[in-house]
Amino acid sequence: MKSKLVLLVGFALLLSMTAFAQEYPKIEVPVGFSFVNVHPNQAVITSFNVFGGGGGFVYNFTPIFGIKADFMGYTQGSGVKLTENGQFLGNVSGNLFTYMFGPQIKKHSGKFQPFGEALFGAAHTNLDANICKLEGGCASGSGNNNGFAMEYGLGLDIPITKTIQFRPVEVDYLYTHFGSNHIAGASASQNNFKYVAGVNFTFGGK
């Protein structure tokens, strides 16, 4: 029994020494295009897309573990039409910004380098709306709101050179929680889908 335990401990130490002996970048800087399919949980707005992009910063502490900062911005400039039973009620347009931080796990070797992340932070939105009553008469307004943001997901990087990687896909579940002061009775929570594609720059290989 003791010999098996010693063997297991030795094998674990060998794996950890092998992992730490691998060369990996100390810093990553991803930038790219992104869109979010927003689900505001409203009867008149089931979902809509906002488009934008941004970047981030990753500091890798080990060959597989790093801490990531992620900053993204989105807009819906053309506006979302509001209808009920075929009747036009108005339109809504606005922006969304997210600022999140958290751990990233990534394989830093081979032709394909998958990664996963879990990020937490804040979101900011501003909204412009024109609302019309069914019996006639319209009103316009605007507002902004700050809330909690969280996302977790997976992605893939493909090395092109030692310092440039192509990121064809990153998909995330993005949760946001705002107050319901924009629309009376609105849900404070939104469950959204996020997609990112772009380039990842790596620096400081160990």
What spans do the regions from the language model cover?
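Cleavable N-terminal export/targeting peptides
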Residues: 1-24, 204-206
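Short sequence motifs at beta-strands and strand-loop junctions characteristic
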Residues: 23, 47-50, 93-97, 142-149, ...
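Subset of outer-membrane beta-barrel
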Residues: 47-49, 157-166, 171-181, 186-192
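Transmembrane beta-strand segments of Gram-negative outer membrane beta-barrel proteins
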Residues: 23-37
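Extracellular loop and loop/strand-boundary signature of outer-membrane beta-barrel proteins
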Residues: 39-43, 83-91, 134-142, 180-187
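Gram-negative (and chloroplast) outer-membrane scaffold detector with strong preference
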Residues: 28, 56-137, 147-148, 158-160, ...
